[in-house]
Curated annotation (Swiss-Prot):
Pfam families: AMP-binding, AMP-binding_C
Reactions mediated catalytically: 2-succinylbenzoate + ATP + CoA = 2-succinylbenzoyl-CoA + AMP + diphosphate
Transmembrane segments: none
Family to which this protein belongs: Belongs to the ATP-dependent AMP-binding enzyme family. MenE subfamily.
Pathway given in the UniProt record: Quinol/quinone metabolism; 1,4-dihydroxy-2-naphthoate biosynthesis; 1,4-dihydroxy-2-naphthoate from chorismate: step 5/7; Quinol/quinone metabolism; menaquinone biosynthesis
Protein known as: 2-succinylbenzoate--CoA ligase
A GO MF label: ATP binding
Biological process according to GO: menaquinone biosynthetic process
SUPFAM superfamilies xref list: Acetyl-CoA synthetase-like
InterPro entries tied to this protein: AMP-bd_C (IPR025110), AMP-bd_C_sf (IPR045851), AMP-binding_CS (IPR020845), AMP-dep_synth/lig_dom (IPR000873), ANL_N_sf (IPR042099), ATP-dep_AMP-bd_enzyme (IPR050237), MenE (IPR010192)
Record's function text: Converts 2-succinylbenzoate (OSB) to 2-succinylbenzoyl-CoA (OSB-CoA).
Entry EC number(s): 6.2.1.26
Keywords, alphabetical: ATP-binding, Ligase, Menaquinone biosynthesis, Nucleotide-binding
């Protein structure tokens, strides 16, 4: 098995220098132009002291600047720690400290006492220094670290190697196929693995990317009709937005795939897509699997409603209960294996040992396989709230609530929301006088906006079992009765 590969972007620029790599609004950049931009960024980063093996935090919005920084860090041999722009300052500082980054590169106003902060403009306006560009990538080396929350609510840095990203792109191509005229519309944030994976596919496939800096349903709807887009990644809310704008119309037949993540879509939504000839491929994946690991072909979108499909070609999947593989239709934990699966979490040896055993990743998600091997996901890590495609862990919100001096107990569950699918709802036992407004304002100061509960309800006591474990299902029943 190969241990190294040529520098991906440099090789792509050599093979197809004049092919369009990235389109942003009206700007077009070829692969050779992209390579040249990246070399320049690489030389500027070298001047500020970035070296091979170091970890550099990246806090940027979708755009050419972020693309060039991610590639430039790989040219240097540094590890990109990709930060979610929607997180609070406290959350970002915690992740940077945990990842042991040497600096932060950002396109935003941000201050940190113990970490050098460089604005992208500041870096590019400064001097250059000759860089030692990596001619080859070791597939075993870490390329990125992306933070994901575990069921404890404590974020964990998922280490993804060059080999993980390569395997993910290969698996996707074997599943969806490749065409010379392919163009993938990228509207997912690149700090998420789903958005980042498109940058990898871009240079590996030599495929054009139409990058949308910020989610804009009107722009995306028009682009699908006029810009030659063949593939787009979406979540259910985005698909709903697009169908609303489509009305009685249809999209061009050249749109060959809508890759749908973030949970199963409702059957009426899929039926509308079938009527309009929109091929929807439902997927299942996570940061730890470098994006998708299962996909349901559009051929089965109505006959296997709710299924996430079968594993990608080089991946394996099984359902376990108490360490034993269970038969079809028996519920259990989803366990996966493949070359796209992370080797572990940064500085979290215990979590790595607990989650990954003999190469098998224990996802913490519940599901079952039918008699044909199609996966059905029952619960996303059981307590997980998925809001507009963003993962929200109740434990993190509860930790913030419990830090309020007038809160004795706290429990958080998901509440159905027409716009976002789910939003957090909090239940609180007071230890003193406090209002709902004060509780919510306190959360706004500590959490990303999408994590702030939409309601805070007061109870005399929280429902618990004999072991005093919080019974979230009873809180969910209370939410349904509201």
């Amino acid at each position: 098995m190969m241990e190294t590969m040529p520098n991906w972007l440099k090789q792509r620029a050599f093979l197809t220098p004049d092919r369009t790599a990235i389109e942003i609004e009206e700007e077009k950049v070829t692969f050779m132009q992209l390579h040249e931009k990246v070399v320049s960024v690489c030389e500027h980063l070298t001047h500020v002291g970035v070296k091979r093996g170091q970890k550099v935090a990246v806090l940027m919005k979708n755009g050419m600047e972020m693309i060039t920084v991610i590639h430039a860090l790989s040219y240097v041999g540094a590890v990109a720690v990709l930060l979610n722009t929607r997180l609070s300052r406290e959350e970002l500082l915690w992740q940077m400290d945990d990842a042991e980054v040497i600096c932060l590169v950002t396109d935003q106003d941000f201050e940190a006492k113990d970490i050098p902060v460089y604005s992208f403009a500041e870096v590019m306006n400064g001097p250059k220094e000759e860089a030692s560009i990596q001619e080859e990538f070791s597939l075993r080396e870490a390329m990125t670290i992306i933070y994901t929350s575990g069921t404890t609510g404590k974020p964990k840095g998922v280490i993804l190697t060059y080999g993980n990203h390569w395997a993910s792109a290969v698996g996707s191509s074997l599943n969806l196929g490749l065409r010379d005229d392919d163009c993938w519309l990228a509207c997912m944030p690149m700090f998420h693995v789903g958005g980042l994976s498109l940058l990898m596919k871009n240079i590996m496939y030599g495929m054009r990317i139409l990058l949308v800096p910020k989610y804009d349903a009107d722009f995306i709807h028009k682009a699908l009709q006029t810009r030659g887009v063949t593939i787009i990644s979406v979540v259910s809310k985005m698909l709903t937005d697009l169908l609303e704008r489509l009305g009685e119309g249809t999209y061009p037949s050249s749109l060959r795939c809508m890759l749908l993540g973030g949970g199963p879509a409702p059957k009426p939504l899929l039926e509308t897509c079938v009527d309009k000839g929109i091929p929807v491929y439902q997927t299942y994946g996570m940061t730890e699997t470098s994006s998708q690991i299962c996909t349901l072909s559009a051929d089965y979108m109505l006959t296997k409603v709710g299924s996430a499909g079968k594993p990608l070609f080089q991946c394996q999947l099984r359902i376990e209960k108490d360490g034993v593989v269970v038969p079809p239709f028996a519920e259990g934990e989803i366990v996966v294996k493949g070359p796209n699966v992370t080797g572990g979490y940064f500085n979290r040896e215990d979590a790595t040992r607990e989650t990954i055993q003999n190469g098998w990743l224990h996802t913490g998600d519940l599901g079952y396989l039918d008699e044909e091997g199609f996966l059905y996901v029952l619960d996303r890590r059981s307590d997980l709230i998925i809001s507009g495609g963003e993962n929200i862990y109740p434990a993190q919100i509860e930790e913030v609530l419990l830090s309020h001096p007038m809160v004795a107990e706290a429990g958080v569950v998901g509440m159905t929301d027409d716009k976002w699918g789910q939003v957090p709802a909090a239940f609180v036992v007071k230890s003193g006088e406090v209002t709902e407004e004060e509780i919510l304002h306190f959360c706004e100061e500590k959490l990303a906006k999408y994590k702030v509960p939409k309601k805070a309800c007061f109870l005399e006591e929280l429902p618990r079992n004999a072991s005093k474990k919080l019974l979230r299902r009873e809180l969910r029943q209370l939410v349904e009765e509201m």
